[in-house]
């Protein structure tokens, strides 16, 4: 299987995991209820996020849809163009694409994004699997850029 096909399968599997977790939460946890998952570390709750990160820009679903489509198109184009470059770059973009599309599916099908993870040890926003993909993907891209910068300075 070509590298592009492998990346596409990974993106689909990641989206599937995100949607599976969201579906479980919607089916098993009443809206707003908090359940301890890993005591003193992580709780599960069911939150309908109609905004962006930290619930900003509430009820602007078409704005988010357009932005997501533009960013995803750019990320997919860049990934396609640089597929043979850095494994870090491919990994980071794969996570970003899966995370963006996972939340996009929620916005288009329900009008909100399902969030569920609450960190008990810090005051932090409730987030979901797709948000985790996006966050880790951005960190991996930053590492890829730093590695490229360091390697570029050696030449």
PLM region spans:
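Alpha-helical transmembrane bundles and membrane-interface segments of multipass inner-membrane proteins
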Residues: 1-155
